[in-house]
């Protein structure tokens, strides 16, 4: 009977452990600076991402197979749901939340000049913005 209570106590102690364990394949072997790393986007090309002040939202530019023009999205970090907040026309870049309130945001866009995507630059001589 005594062994039963000891076993039950041990199971309860280990079962109630609240510390999260991260099985994180994104962290490279030998990395000393990350404890955990979480991938937030899973499709398309995503770039220039910035968190709002309290870390609950992420603003970023992205495009997928439907369009080769980057558009601006805001993601709710907890749910992972993203919403396009730019016009969907032209191409966009350089989005930021207004600080410190972060209720507004700003970004650059070509949509007033043309609703279509601009021609892709020649990358043969290196990066072109």
Tell what function each PLM region has.
Residues 42-45, 61-71, 87-92, 108-129:
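A flexible loop/linker signature enriched in serine peptidases of the S9 family
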Residues 4-13:
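Sec-dependent N-terminal signal peptides
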Residues 20-35:
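Blade/loop signatures of beta-propeller domains
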Residues 55-59, 105-106:
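Hydrophobic beta-strand positions that form the internal "hydrophobic ladder"
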Residues 76-80:
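Short loop/turn segments that connect beta-strands within beta-propeller blades
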Residues 53-54, 99-101:
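Residue-level detector of Asp-centered blade-edge/turn motifs that repeat once per structural unit
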């Amino acid at each position: 009977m005594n062994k039963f209570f000891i076993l039950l106590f041990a199971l309860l102690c280990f079962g109630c452990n609240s510390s999260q364990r991260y099985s994180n394949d994104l962290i490279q072997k030998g990395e000393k600076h990350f404890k955990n790393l979480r991938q937030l986007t899973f499709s398309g090309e995503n770039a220039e991402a910035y968190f709002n002040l309290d870390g609950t939202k992420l603003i970023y530019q992205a495009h997928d197979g439907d369009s080769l023009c980057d558009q601006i999205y805001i993601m709710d970090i907890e749910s992972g749901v993203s919403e396009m907040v730019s016009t969907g026309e032209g191409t966009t870049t350089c989005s930021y939340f207004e600080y410190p309130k972060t209720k507004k945001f700003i970004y650059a866009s070509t949509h007033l000049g043309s609703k279509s995507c601009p021609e892709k630059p020649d990358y043969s001589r290196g990066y072109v913005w």
